[in-house]
């Protein structure tokens, strides 16, 4: 219950039901449920995310991180955060209501013209330019995390895995994001910076053009092995040369040669093909017509545990919470949930520590094996995949590698004992 005490100290204890009227449910995911609501004082429409902290212990740090980042942001290109309220074990997070749905929703009725794509990408770039100027990395850019207002305004959302760079920490090395959109340097857990978001933007550009990211037909774990090894994806098909060049610029495997968000705003695909954001209302209307015709009912929650239907049948936006790899509790991510920067962070939830054998045994052994293979002219690809498998397993289940090593040692000891016993009886 320590995490509840921490939240109670940092969030208003005013009964949120006195301040807000909860209306239709417009989304459901691993972080809880999202409702359309009304601010009783201003009569403004808001989004209310309600999380049961007792049921979401594994997500406490992500919730803290999202609130921390959102409370520090002040940009028309970032979803606005209005405050948090704790009622019993339920945390109410009040945010800007964006009734146009996500960019992923807008893809469902069919392909987008390049003018729409360029306009959406321009607004994402403005959001990234702001975040990066604030020394923040989003780390999970994709169509599902781009929301639109009913007027066509485009805003970045879902900051549960966003990272903060300090003056003394120029690059990060935590393994987070969604596999298909993840930059090679993030997968390899090399030091990385804002340029990781630019790679994800390039994948998102392909997603907007094709309806899905590259390698979407493969298992996500397989994709994590392929992205660092393979050549960067390219935009194939009947698309303009400037669009293909934009994608190519984003998807340079060497992050040093990827342009910044500010530089990409000057790219000819952005400067020549974009229109005002009000132009995007055509896509929002298209999606609403498509939904009203009964499409998407069967597959609306196919990729995540979403329920996007309003209870009264109203066509509300689907607030998506797709599967994302989250940072381990021992990453150097600056955490802490606060309404004001002077407040202390909530007590972190204790979790299983990462395996010690990774640094003392696994990595040294793989390093020696790879060196021997290189000297003999052999390929180290299979060894790198196996080494990466340990890291991936550790992210989802900290401590699993140590358990594996204990079992292996016990098995070897039993085998050696049995063998010695047989030898001594002969």
Swiss-Prot record:
Name the Gene Ontology molecular function terms of this record.
Answer: ATP binding; metal ion binding; protein homodimerization activity; protein kinase activity; protein serine kinase activity; protein serine/threonine kinase activity
Keyword Kinase appears in the UniProt entry: yes
| Residues with PTM Phosphothreonine | 174
Q: Which UniProt keywords apply?
A: ATP-binding, Cytoplasm, Golgi apparatus, Kinase, Magnesium, Metal-binding, Nucleotide-binding, Phosphoprotein, Serine/threonine-protein kinase, Transferase
Gene Ontology BP term (one)? establishment of Golgi localization
Q: Which CDD domains does the record match to this protein?
A: STKc_STK25
Annotated Acidic residues bias:
299-314
* E.C. designation(s): 2.7.11.1
Q: How is its activity regulated?
A: Interaction with Golgi matrix protein GOLGA2 leads to autophosphorylation on Thr-174, possibly as a consequence of stabilization of dimer formation. The C-terminal non-catalytic region inhibits the kinase activity.
Give the transmembrane region(s): none
Q: Which GO terms describe its cellular component?
A: cytoplasm; extracellular exosome; FAR/SIN/STRIPAK complex; Golgi apparatus
Q: Using the UniProt annotation, give all residue ranges assigned to the region (Disordered).
A: 291-355
Q: Where does ATP bind?
A: 26-34, 49
Summarize the impact of residue 49 to R: Loss of kinase activity and autophosphorylation
- Its predominant location is cytoplasm
Q: Where is the active site?
A: 140 (proton acceptor)
What Pfam families does this protein map onto?
A: PDCD10_N, Pkinase
Q: What does the entry state regarding organ or tissue expression?
A: Ubiquitously expressed. Highest levels are found in testis, large intestine, brain and stomach followed by heart and lung.
Q: Which residues carry this modification: Phosphoserine?
A: 278
The annotated subunit structure for this chain is: Homodimer. Interacts with CTTNBP2NL. Part of the core of STRIPAK complexes composed of PP2A catalytic and scaffolding subunits, the striatins (PP2A regulatory subunits), the striatin-associated proteins MOB4, STRIP1 and STRIP2, PDCD10 and members of the STE20 kinases, such as STK24 and STK26. Interacts with TAOK3 (via N-terminus); the interaction promotes STK25 abundance at the level of protein expression and/or stability.
Q: Which family does it belong to?
A: Belongs to the protein kinase superfamily. STE Ser/Thr protein kinase family. STE20 subfamily.
What is the protein's known function?
Answer: Oxidant stress-activated serine/threonine kinase that may play a role in the response to environmental stress. Targets to the Golgi apparatus where it appears to regulate protein transport events, cell adhesion, and polarity complexes important for cell migration. Part of the striatin-interacting phosphatase and kinase (STRIPAK) complexes. STRIPAK complexes have critical roles in protein (de)phosphorylation and are regulators of multiple signaling pathways including Hippo, MAPK, nuclear receptor and cytoskeleton remodeling.
Q: Under which name does UniProt file this protein? A: Serine/threonine-protein kinase 25
Annotated organism of origin: Homo sapiens
| Upper classification of the organism | Eukaryota, Metazoa, Chordata, Craniata, Vertebrata
Q: Which gene encodes it?
A: STK25
